[in-house]
Curated annotation (Swiss-Prot):
Name of the molecule in the record: Vacuolar membrane protein KLLA0F03465g
Compositionally biased region (Polar residues): 319-328
Principal location listed in the UniProt entry: membrane
Spans annotated as Disordered: 19-93, 289-359
Family: Belongs to the PRM5 family.
Keyword DNA-binding: no
Keyword Electron transport: no
Topological type in the membrane: Single-pass membrane protein
Record-linked InterPro entries: PRM
Record-annotated membrane-spanning stretches: 114-134
Localisation: Vacuole membrane
Keywords: Membrane, Transmembrane, Transmembrane helix, Vacuole
Amino acid sequence: MDLEYYEASAVVLEERALPALTTSTEETTAKQTSTNTDDDKTTSTSTSTSTGTSSKNTKLPSLTTKTTDGSTLTTSTGTSSTETASYTTPVMELPSAKGNPNIWSSNKPTGTVFIAVGSAAGFIFLALLVWFIINTWMSYSQAKQLKKFNNMEKQFQNPFIDDIDFSSGGGYYKADEDISTYKDTPVPTKNGGNNSFTPYKRASHSMIRLLGGSTDDGFGGGTPSSIGNTNLGSMNPLERVDAIDAANTGVRKSLYISPTMEVMNQQRRSTLFNNLNQSAVSIDTPEMMEPTRTVSPERRTYKHEKSKSSLSKLVDSTIDLTASTTLDNQKRQGRSKGHNKSSSITPSVYLDNMLEDNS
């Protein structure tokens, strides 16, 4: 039996995985023995040993091809061996943003946009609330003041103003809360008496006449015919003027003021007060006479005569009454002065006469 040794080169084709690099080596030894016993019968025995190492497990079987110098081609299937391998997994880390110009970073606190928007909305809401409160308060004040003025206007336009109870708080000054403190408080007068009228009723004659009321002093609402029942001779000139004014204008129900009547009243007052000391008596009525430089003297004289002739019928009774009263007073004063001059009694003689009368 001839033993022949063949050296064969083998190429292994196997699956590889990336990126790891796998290398493998394999050594194969083949031994063949042939024995010829007879001429007609030939027996051939071949032994093949294959050893190999691999650094990775393979899923598919490897293919081994051997080539010999002779005419015999032998193909065999090799088996792969199992080995243990260890792998290291790297840890992924994010790059730092510090000093990196390619990464944007903000130095503002978190929620800056939310804080800015909320602050702006809150400021607007607060401003609207303050404006609403101020507008409401101003409207309330104006409405209250307007209501007060409307009440005053209604009182002035009331033809029955004398029937209003001023002490009950329904008068012109309704807003005064302390009206009850001087409701019935008597006020001392010049003559020593007490005036129990309230401050609302102690108004001037001109205001009461404009409002359509009376003076509440015994002459309000009087008429020219009722003056004859009053003793004008027992009054001082100021009281007589008030009585005549109240009698002439007590029926006034409007706010219209006649300039002609005011001029007549001014002339009548000047006639009544000609014997009084002008420094001690003050007239509340403003001067209503015409200015001296407004018209020429000719026109002024013509106008005076015309007004005097047209108004003579209205004031005949009043002028006659006041003239007669003035003449009576002048006569009395003249008689008293003449009597004093004629007698000229000294104090000692006057005392002697008193003692003689008593005895």
